[in-house]
């Protein structure tokens, strides 16, 4: 457009300078500037033929390559989504198993505490019963020993009384003789 404007300016200046010969020369130049109808038509037909040939030769392979590339990209996107879904599922499963493991561990700890407390209670109860039996046995033994000592003491006292009475009977009973017999008896024993 700019070229055409420059040419028309030059043409106007030349026309005004030389009106006769230059005018004809300019008309010839303008005519050669634009193609003729047969040339224009031949160029247009050649262009359409080139476009059609390129269309049939290049369009199908390019379209096929683009379709293959599009399928490859879509396949990768689908695989990525599938992998992402699988990894989310596995993560959820792992979290679920971890929560179950924590729950199991808490349950085991709780059961262990309960079992430990029951074992402690059982052994405490056994120890109390055993100590109670030992104390009862000791009381029984003490009572038995005390009773034995009382019986022995009674027996000894009875024997002593019999001995004293025998000795007193052999002698005349006076207060002094009785005291003397008791002293002698106690010295012997």
Curated annotation (Swiss-Prot):
Q: Disulfide bonds, which pairs?
A: none
Q: What is its main location?
A: membrane
Q: Which SUPFAM superfamilies match?
A: F1F0 ATP synthase subunit B, membrane domain
Membrane topology annotation:
Single-pass membrane protein
Zinc as UniProt keyword: no
Please name the GO terms that the record assigns under molecular function.
Answer: proton-transporting ATP synthase activity, rotational mechanism; proton-transporting ATPase activity, rotational mechanism
- UniProt xrefs under InterPro entries: ATP_synth_B-like_membr_sf, ATP_synth_b/b'su_bac/chlpt, ATP_synth_F0_bsu_bac, ATP_synthase_B_chain
Q: Which domain of life is it from?
A: Bacteria
Q: Which GO terms describe its cellular component?
A: plasma membrane; proton-transporting ATP synthase complex
Cite the entry's keywords alphabetically: ATP synthesis, Cell membrane, CF(0), Hydrogen ion transport, Ion transport, Membrane, Transmembrane, Transmembrane helix, Transport
- Write out the transmembrane intervals: 38-58
Under the heading Pfam families, the entry gives:
ATP-synt_B
Subcellular location(s) per record = Cell membrane
Q: Which family does it belong to?
A: Belongs to the ATPase B chain family.
| Matching PANTHER family | ATP SYNTHASE SUBUNIT B, ATP SYNTHASE SUBUNIT B', CHLOROPLASTIC
The job of this chain, per UniProt, is described as: F(1)F(0) ATP synthase produces ATP from ADP in the presence of a proton or sodium gradient. F-type ATPases consist of two structural domains, F(1) containing the extramembraneous catalytic core and F(0) containing the membrane proton channel, linked together by a central stalk and a peripheral stalk. During catalysis, ATP synthesis in the catalytic domain of F(1) is coupled via a rotary mechanism of the central stalk subunits to proton translocation.
Q: How does it assemble?
A: F-type ATPases have 2 components, F(1) - the catalytic core - and F(0) - the membrane proton channel. F(1) has five subunits: alpha(3), beta(3), gamma(1), delta(1), epsilon(1). F(0) has three main subunits: a(1), b(2) and c(10-14). The alpha and beta chains form an alternating ring which encloses part of the gamma chain. F(1) is attached to F(0) by a central stalk formed by the gamma and epsilon chains, while a peripheral stalk is formed by the delta and b chains.
Protein's name according to its UniProt entry: ATP synthase subunit b
Which organism does this sequence originate in? Mycoplasmopsis agalactiae (strain NCTC 10123 / CIP 59.7 / PG2) (Mycoplasma agalactiae)
Query: What gene codes for this chain?
Result: atpF
């Amino acid at each position: 457009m700019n070229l055409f404007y420059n040419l028309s300016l030059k043409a106007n200046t030349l026309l005004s300078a030389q009106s006769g010969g230059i005018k004809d020369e300019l008309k010839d130049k303008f005519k050669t500037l634009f193609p003729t109808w047969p040339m224009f038509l031949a160029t247009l037909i050649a262009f359409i033929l080139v476009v059609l040939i390129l269309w049939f030769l290049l369009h199908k392979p390019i379209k096929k390559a683009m379709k293959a590339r599009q399928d490859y990209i879509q396949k990768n996107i689908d695989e990525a989504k599938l992998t992402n879904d699988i990894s989310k599922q596995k993560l959820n499963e792992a979290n679920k198993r971890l929560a179950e493991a924590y729950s199991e561990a808490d349950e085991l700890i709780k059961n262990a505490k309960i079992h430990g407390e029951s074992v402690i209670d059982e052994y405490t109860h056994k120890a109390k019963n055993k100590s109670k039996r030992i104390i009862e046995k000791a009381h029984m033994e003490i009572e038995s020993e005390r009773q034995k000592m009382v019986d022995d003491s009674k027996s000894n006292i009875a024997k002593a009384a019999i001995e004293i009475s025998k000795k007193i009977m052999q002698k005349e009973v006076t207060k002094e003789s009785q005291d003397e017999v008791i002293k002698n008896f106690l010295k012997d024993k």
